[in-house]
Every structure is written in C-alpha cells, then in structure tokens.
Amino acid sequence: MKILWFAHRDIKHPKAGGAERTIYEVGRRLVKLGVDMYLVTVNPGNLLNYEVVDGIKTYRTKGNIRAHLNVRKMLRRIEPDAIIDDMDHALPWCSPWFTNKRVIVFFRHLHARSLPGQVNIVLAKIITFIEKMYPSIYKNNIFVTESNTSENDLIHLGIKKENIIRIPPGVDLKLFHPGEKTKIVQLLYFGGLRKYKRPGYAIKVYEDLYNEIKDLKLIITGDGPILNELKEKIKDKNYNIDFLGKIDYNTLAEIIRESWVNLHFSVTEGWGYSLLESSASGTPSVAFRVPGVVDTVKNDYNGFLVGNINEFRSKILYIIKNEELFIKNSRKFAENYTWEKTAKMWYDLLNNNVDNR
C-alpha cells in the first residue's frame, strides 16, 4: 500500500510541534507495517529537498504556495493508493480536485477559534471562510480528527457524522515516564510562546504562589513571538524563573518528569499533546476548561480543569499536598494512549479505503 501524506511541516522543521510528532510517529510505524510512505511538505530553507526519515520518503518544496501548486504533480509522480490531506495549518491541499481516489482529511482543530490576536482581521476572515469551504472541497471524503471537540466542530461546519472518524494520538511511554521530583516545588510551562497559548499567565500563577511556597521555581520552555515580552515582565524581579527556549525532546522529557505541576493556558487545542506527555511523566496539569483540553485532562484525576486564572493557585496547592496520588493517576491515564494503537487505527482506515470509492 502506497500512502501520500500532504502536510506543511515535518518533524525536522524548526517549528515542529505536536502535529508533526503525530505524522512522524504514525508514519514510521506504518512503514514497519509494510506501507510505502511518502510525505510532501514545505522546506523552511535549511533542510534537504528529499530525504528518508525513519522510512518516510520526505519531499520538501520551498514555499507554501509552491507546495500547494505541486499537489497535482506529486499525485501523478507517486501514484498513491490513498492520500492524506493534513489540515494543521488551515489551508486545504484540495487533493480531490486532482484525483478520483479517496482522500482522507486530517482535521486537527478549528483555527477560527484561535485567530483573534494572532492575525489581522482581514486574514482571520479569510481563514474562517476557507474552513467553511471544507465540506464543499472534501465532499463525501473521510475526516479524521483526534478529539470530541474537533468532531463537534466538523459537524458544525457541515461534515456528516458518518464521515468522521476519531483517532486519538499516542505518547511515548518509554521516554515520558514518572521519576524523582525536584526537592523544591517546580512548576512548568512548555509549549509555543504565542498569544493564544497565553504563557504570560504562568508568571501570574507564580506570583500568586510566590509567598506561599518556599523557593518556588518556574520553568518556561519553548520559543515564539512573545518570548522577549515575557522576559521583560520579570527583568527587575527577584524571581526563580528560567526561560530555556526550544530544547531537544529528551531534555524536555527530563524536565517534565521532575516538575510537580504542568501549567496550560491555551484558548483552544485540537488535542493537548503536551498535556498527554505531562500525564505520562507523572506530572499532573492545571488547565483552562477549553475545547480540546477537556479530552486530555480528567478533572481531579490527572489534574484540574478551571474556569478562571484565580483558580490555579488552590488547585496547585491541592496537587502538592496529594502528590503521590496525582503521579499515579496521571501515568494511569496516559497508558491508554500508545503510538502503536494510533498507528494501527490509521493503518486499518487506510487499508479499508484503498480503491474504495
């Protein structure tokens, strides 16, 4: 079975995140299951135009526009048995316009919900309009999504429920596992430093607890457009806050493992990848009760879902007092999600849709 996956980024892209992790983890496991796996993506300028990454034959085109213009060419060149159009960046690949074969659409989340404050009003309206066109572009094709939230968003857009399949992501349970916590209480924020992720709240939470927890420490990892703004907030403060920037995956796993509580403030998620990695590491999360996150945090089990920023303080203090129970429950929750299970679900779906139109 030959599969062609269109996506805007791959695992080696400097801005790769949870979405690209899914492509990589699923893709390399599909290869082991005998799939001839092709990935067509965008070259940020510093990567090879072609290379094989753990069995995934990766073609990179310079520029988003050129990548989209190459869809027909790549379909003819590779002649796949099944196609995946990955919608992590909203702009559709429109593969059904160039092939009669079944196209599977990988819908991550509704971008319209996270656009305010990220792009100008005109661009926000354009992206929102494009998302509303999905039912027309991908009429009668299968949509795969990861969460109940995203499934409901698709139905709201006009996609038939019978054309939607939920395949949750997995987590590397060997890399992300419980371990010894730091001697002093260490809070963690890890993820993109963008406005809709609201990482600035991490500093607010730290300040709320500063006089209650001795030697309290906060670690903020990741990169993004508001990094300098966050640093500016604390430059004259005597806070124990470290900005680590973008770090490698193994180092990230170690930091998550040793932290006491993971903080999450995003406006919305398709699926909370970081929340699942934190849970696997025995590190509970406190997060806002927002779309996508509600699928990844079970209230009062592997963390807490709250309605406003002022609730973070009491929930963190409660977790600290009941640390061992939350470590145990967090790991138990994550053990339901493995990349092997996710890849098998993808394999069965793809296999059932080859030449089945």
Model-derived features: where do they sit?
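Carbohydrate-associated surface elements
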Residues: 149, 170
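Short alpha-helical donor nucleotide-sugar binding micro-motif in glycosyltransferases
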Residues: 246-247, 254-259
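Conserved donor-binding/catalytic core segment of Leloir-type glycosyltransferases
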Residues: 4, 144, 180-208, 219
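Aromatic "clamp/platform" in nucleotide-sugar-dependent glycosyltransferases that forms part
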Residues: 267
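Nucleotide-activated donor-binding/catalytic signature segment of Leloir-type glycosyltransferases, i.e.
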Residues: 231-247
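Membrane-proximal helix-turn-helix segments that form the acceptor-binding/catalytic region
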Residues: 122-144
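Conserved acidic donor-binding segment of nucleotide-sugar-dependent glycosyltransferases
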Residues: 299-310, 318-322
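Short hydrophobic beta-strand element within catalytic cores of glycosyltransferases
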Residues: 275, 284-287
